[in-house]
Amino acid sequence: MSQENSVHRSSTKKTPIKIAFIHPDLGIGGAERLVVDAAVGLQSLGKEVVVFTSHCDKKHCFEEIRDGTIKVKVYGDWLPSSIFGRLSIFCSSLRQVYLTMILLTNYMHFDAIIVDQLSTCVPFLLLASQMILFYCHFPDKYLAKRGGILKKLYRIPFDTVEAESVRLADRIVVNSKFTASVFKKAFPKIRKPLRIVHPCVDIEAASKPLEFQLPEKILQRKLLISVNRFERKKDIRLAIDAFSALRDLSANRFPEYLLLVAGGYDIRVSENRRYLKELQEFCEQKDLSYTTVKDNWDNITVAPSTNVLFLLSVPSKVRDALISSSRILLYTPENEHFGIVPLEAMLRKVPVLAQTNGGPLETVIDGKNGWLRPRDAKIWGNVIYEATTSTTYDTAAMGEAGSEWVKNEFSTDAMARKFESEIMSGIRSITPEKRLMRRVNGLLAVFVLFMLFWGTCIIAATVPFAIIKLYFAQTYSSVKLGFMLGTCIVSVSFLTFTVYAKLTNL
């Protein structure tokens, strides 16, 4: 159904605008939280929303999905998400293309489609007439772990597909100014304007009574909290180092403090296990006693001598109680894409101490609802000391200011209205002439993707034979021929799209 018909229909017969989301894996994470919040928000504005995904486990998803608040369609879960723990981006792309084919052949009634994380499906969607909005949490090429020469060669076609498919979207939206700057660096040839729609937090959550009560012995301490997954890139070590620096400034009163290190922890993830051990060893180096809690939340016991309390994979109700009872949130990640945790803390009137880079530059107003300081443990320790022992900072007023700031700027309604504005302006921008050009672009891009896929497969297939040829030299000519054929196909694909992009100024 065409966009003109859709808009005309909605304006005359009051039929709601229909919106589809395409998301790879609808689990529990920041990207998934945004999709859920956006879907719920758009529904509250009268839109009909369906989320399409390749995987959704009802035992491991957000409540709005589990209770049916959001309509979810799952297709392609039977396809592998990886092959022997590898080729995950290849499998994810394949699953998304399959999902897109189902959507295009069975669900043609949508007015707009929002794609996030993976953009492989965008060229295929151009074959229809729906407006396409791509939401970039962070460029995938920078998220992927880099390896040796083979990994770099493997990533080339997928990084190229990401760049060329993203540029075909009608609207490109990012989650922060920081991500926008990284996006421009990652894709310098994309000239389309970038819109910013910040993630949101549940404003009503702060007005509800806490469902969990911390033990009195913990509440008697001056609590500082760090909430992050147990990953090195989150730089939790900085919080412990700053806490140690606090002792140098206030040795006599230091026993009054307790550092809470809470976050996502999966024992199956080796990095989680290793990093927790590193942090515990760092506590020992700094002569800080610690206790680790991973269950039995109703009976948390902490000795008076404990300085650091590690809390692994805390339930939401416990997490809310921990944040609400803390004096300061120590938000340690460097160059974080956006950062939801600072918003959650400010909503509960807890000031935030963060680094002078990344997403917090857009959420933390230095001196008003928190502090922005360089990565220096002594500087951080001094801020903690002054905020908790002197009148230098009115932390109560900062907490109130932070709560109002979040309620006004980062509510679900505010985010939904920004999405609605981008969607409606995108729909109106698609003229009949533009629709024809979109389909031409889509056909060409699908052809290039098809060629890239088979060319890459041919090249990949020759690698094991190239190794075998060391023992069976007679097969080398066939291997060489196959490698050359695959290389030619990939090269022609790149050349075709490059020339076309230049001619059409994509």
Curated annotation (Swiss-Prot):
Pathway assigned in UniProt: Protein modification; protein glycosylation
Q: Where are the transmembrane segments?
A: 82-104, 118-138, 443-463, 481-501
Domain of life per record: Eukaryota
The main place the protein resides is: endoplasmic reticulum
Q: Which residues are glycosylated?
A: 299
| Family to which the UniProt record says this protein belongs | Belongs to the glycosyltransferase group 1 family. Glycosyltransferase 4 subfamily.
User: What name does this protein carry?
Assistant: Alpha-1,3/1,6-mannosyltransferase alg2
Q: Which residues form a coiled coil?
A: none
Q: Which GO terms describe its molecular function?
A: alpha-1,3-mannosyltransferase activity; GDP-Man:Man1GlcNAc2-PP-Dol alpha-1,3-mannosyltransferase activity; GDP-Man:Man2GlcNAc2-PP-dolichol alpha-1,6-mannosyltransferase activity
Which of UniProt's keywords are assigned here?
Answer: Endoplasmic reticulum, Glycoprotein, Glycosyltransferase, Membrane, Transferase, Transmembrane, Transmembrane helix
Its biological function?
Mannosylates Man(2)GlcNAc(2)-dolichol diphosphate and Man(1)GlcNAc(2)-dolichol diphosphate to form Man(3)GlcNAc(2)-dolichol diphosphate.
Q: What is the topology of this protein in the membrane according to its UniProt annotation? A: Multi-pass membrane protein
Q: Does the keyword Endoplasmic reticulum apply?
A: yes
According to its UniProt record, the EC number is 2.4.1.132, 2.4.1.257
State if Glycoprotein is listed as a keyword: yes
- Enzyme's top EC category: transferase
List the catalytic activities from the record: a beta-D-Man-(1->4)-beta-D-GlcNAc-(1->4)-alpha-D-GlcNAc-diphospho-di-trans,poly-cis-dolichol + GDP-alpha-D-mannose = an alpha-D-Man-(1->3)-beta-D-Man-(1->4)-beta-D-GlcNAc-(1->4)-alpha-D-GlcNAc-diphospho-di-trans,poly-cis-dolichol + GDP + H(+); an alpha-D-Man-(1->3)-beta-D-Man-(1->4)-beta-D-GlcNAc-(1->4)-alpha-D-GlcNAc-diphospho-di-trans,poly-cis-dolichol + GDP-alpha-D-mannose = an alpha-D-Man-(1->3)-[alpha-D-Man-(1->6)]-beta-D-Man-(1->4)-beta-D-GlcNAc-(1->4)-alpha-D-GlcNAc-diphospho-di-trans,poly-cis-dolichol + GDP + H(+)
Q: What is the lineage of its organism?
A: Eukaryota, Fungi, Dikarya, Ascomycota, Taphrinomycotina
Biological-process GO terms, alphabetical: dolichol-linked oligosaccharide biosynthetic process
Instruction: Please name the CDD domains in this protein's record.
Output: GT4_ALG2-like
Q: Where in the cell is it found?
A: Endoplasmic reticulum membrane
GO terms under cellular component: cytoplasmic side of endoplasmic reticulum membrane; endomembrane system
Q: Which Pfam families match?
A: Glyco_transf_4, Glycos_transf_1
Q: PANTHER family recorded for this chain? A: ALPHA-1,3/1,6-MANNOSYLTRANSFERASE ALG2 (PTHR45918), ALPHA-1,3_1,6-MANNOSYLTRANSFERASE ALG2 (PTHR45918:SF1)
